[in-house]
Amino acid sequence: MIFKIPDLLTPEELAQITDQLALSEFIDGKLTAGWHAKLVKNNQQLSRQDSTYDALKGLLQKALERNPLFQVAARPKIVHSVLFSRYTDGMAYGRHTDNALMGGSSFLRSDLSFTVFLNPPGAYEGGDLVIESADSETAYKLEAGTAIIYPSTTLHRVDPVTSGERLVAVGWVQSLVRDASQRELLFDLETVRRSLFAQGGKTDEFDLLSKSVANLLRQWVE
């Protein structure tokens, strides 16, 4: 399941992030890539040793924590390995899949990947995020403050930036529910449950559906 979150970040949060990134130290993105991804990764990233990194990462994580769509659809156990990336003229990230395990010896699983767009699409040419499916591919170039969340199992790429500057935050989620089809089923049931409550309050049908959602969580949560 791929889903977008418009306005994940407020205008004030966006301004805070972009203002600080403009003054921060960026390093070669290959330093955080797997051995095969290094061959196709050409971007820059905010150094994790930079004095602003922890604050910006915390701001982004809080935005995800407060967002109900992200919480219900992703069922996050932990959001990890956050990176702030910059692409300028000629930079790209070729076709790749994300590492299954991240965080060094912590062995954090990547179930879901996310990209948060930090500047408007008019600020750069090219630079689309392209996600492949079995028989097609879809390009995304979204408004500043918007997030897209997609399975880490996919092949995807960032097309070359031909002018301007592309700023994004990327990260990964280890979900409480490992199986993608189970997460989607829980999301659909939760959507129906909330719709029933909005229409009729705490009815017998709402209670029965709530029981089923809770019992599925008991079976599937790790």
For the regions a protein language model found, what residue spans apply to each?
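Non-heme Fe(II)/2-oxoglutarate
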Residues: 1-76, 81-83, 185-222
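Catalytic core of non-heme Fe(II) oxygenases with the double-stranded beta-helix
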Residues: 68-181, 186-187
